[in-house]
Amino acid sequence: NGKALRRVVVTGLGIVSPIGNHAAEVAKSLREGHSGIVRCDKYAEMGFRSHVHGAPEIDFDDHIDRKLRRFMGDGAAYSYIAMGQAISDSGLGEKDVRDLRTGLVVGSGGPSTSAQVVAADLARQKSPKRVGPYAVPKTMCSTLSANMSTAFGMRGLSYSISSACSTSAHCIGNGSELIQMDKQDIVFAGGAEELHWTLTVLFDAMGALSSKYNETPQKASRAYDVNRDGFVIAAGAGVV
């Protein structure tokens, strides 16, 4: 109709990562050149080629009520914490978050693989009745948007995009478009990923993970270096 696209700005952000569990901590780590990549002995014991990963140091019990946590895999839990930070950082109130014009576009590369394996093991080794109803919100591909929209009582547009390592970028881009096209006034966007051997083994089998720097894990993540030999798997969440 010839109308100019609306301007989009970032008013708040939240992050959980191997180098900090808050924006200020992450910024400090980046300035000081701190690496969150460490050796994982479990990978070595299991016979993986890659023995390094990045794991956030955070206690979910300090941040998430047990009744909410039972619906979440670790990725959704990271996302919940990051989104809470983004809400606080933006200065938005509960009424703003629950407004029909406030949306949510968050995703992950996949569901909670650890929850999938646990459910399968329970069904095979004990009984399907032991799996329980909480496995579904952990293992569906829209686990992040389902958990976040429910936990924060959101009523606007809400869905997940999953596109491998581009997931969060696509979610943020799509969230921006929703505002530009006047479909929403506010959108929370980003992504999260859990860290568990059940996911790591898949990329290790592909030969996609770094294995040359197992004894020097802090040097393993070097995406644009001529001596790179794969990516380093890690966990965390980021929401704007």
Feature roles, as predicted:
Residues 103:
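Conserved catalytic-site loops of classical short-chain dehydrogenases/reductases
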Residues 4-5, 21, 35, 40, ...:
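Acyl-thioester C-C bond-transforming condensing/cleaving domain
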Residues 42-92, 106, 141-155:
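A glycine- and small-residue-enriched flexible loop/hinge segment at structural boundaries
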Residues 1-68, 90:
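ACP-dependent fatty acid/polyketide chain-elongation machinery
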